């Protein structure tokens, strides 16, 4: 697997390094699970994954630095089924997203087969200039 970190070049994007994720997954045609990235306002985002057939116990979310990883390991049926048509995927998966420096995960919920991961951008306060008084006597005695 190839890893490219282009996040320093793309800080103006919405908090996600889409190009780096695309390059990292080049050659791996990962289309499961489908997901959306929603922007509520300049500081609030939501990642939603469609996970029909998964249980909350099957899912794991990890945040390591700026890398958000979501893994799913569904419980396998005890007996093999004979499918006439199988359109719903129920397979293990691993997805990762690169977050911008000031992004934080504010919470996650799993409702009706949809995993929602809420993100907040916390912009640091700018450091105010500090005025230094100038005295007439020397600061160091020599």
Curated annotation (Swiss-Prot):
Homodimer. Forms homomultimers of about 100-150 subunits at optimal growth temperatures. Conformation changes to oligomers at high temperatures or high ionic concentrations. The decrease in size of the multimers is accompanied by an increase in chaperone activity. This is Small heat shock protein IbpB. Belongs to the small heat shock protein (HSP20) family. The keyword Cytoplasm applies. It is found in: Cytoplasm. The gene is ibpB. GO terms for cellular component: cytoplasm. It comes from the Bacteria. InterPro entries: A-crystallin/Hsp20_dom (IPR002068), ACD_IbpA/B (IPR037913), HSP20-like_chaperone (IPR008978), HSP20_IbpB (IPR022848). Associates with aggregated proteins, together with IbpA, to stabilize and protect them from irreversible denaturation and extensive proteolysis during heat shock and oxidative stress. Aggregated proteins bound to the IbpAB complex are more efficiently refolded and reactivated by the ATP-dependent chaperone systems ClpB and DnaK/DnaJ/GrpE. Its activity is ATP-independent. The N- and C-terminal flexible termini are involved in oligomerization and in the binding of non-native substrate proteins, and are essential for chaperone activity. Its main location: cytoplasm. CDD domains: ACD_IbpA-B_like. It comes from Escherichia coli O7:K1 (strain IAI39 / ExPEC).
